[in-house]
Amino acid sequence: GFIYEASDVNAAPFYRAFNVSNRKDFAISHPFCQLLLGNNLVDHSGADITANPFEGMEDPRLALYATPNGDGNFVGMPVNESSSEAQVFTWESLPGDKIINVPDYNQSLMEYAEVSFILSELNGWDQTHYENGVRASMERWGVPAASIDAYIAALPPASEETVLTQKYIALYMDAHTAWQEYRRTGFPHTLLMPGTEFSATPVAGTTIDYTFTSLVEGLTDIPFRLQYPDFERTLNGANRSQAVSALSNGDALDSKLWWDVD
């Protein structure tokens, strides 16, 4: 992976934001935190898309992916929370120390865990490659061997959902690839969609109801693509128009790319 060479000039973005700019408005998301805790989301929309295939299994990577809050609990940031609210609310879990407190943090372009999950998919959701992927991801983050063995022993069998959900978990800090995987496969099913009504209990005795309201009117799913920048309209208008005409819904966030078949 790429390694930052000097903390004064090239400090890792999360390190700079947390330690230099004193930002506290970013945290592990509520759906992802619940997935790793082994919980199902409290979803009031009536959809069953938030079922956790690893229900009842707390993932040992959670303690490395995120930092406990002041009460010693892991609490994710609701998807509808504003930056100003995030600055005030102190109950949410920031990214882990290995992320925000390492000035030369590096991220691999492709890890062995991802390769293992690809091999599992290629071989009809193979169990061995599936387990190898989980083990490789946990070893990369420093999970103790005994915890890895116990977690793998409790895993449900390899399937499309379990393999691709574990792949998504392993892609933490590689958001672009995780987004691509969702668009390609439709997994994980634990993501919240625009319009979903849900509840979160950040502290004991405090339950807050939320509605995931999209900032883009009419959007009902996670965006499938980014729109062309405005300068393409003026500097490359003809080619832009030709490209837009080939999209399923024009230059919109919900137009699928050619490889996005699910």
Question: Would you name each region that the model predicts?
Answer:
Residues 134-140, 144-262:
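C-terminal functional modules
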Residues 1-119, 125-170, 174-176, 185, ...:
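Hydrophobic-face positions in mid-chain alpha helices that act as interaction patches
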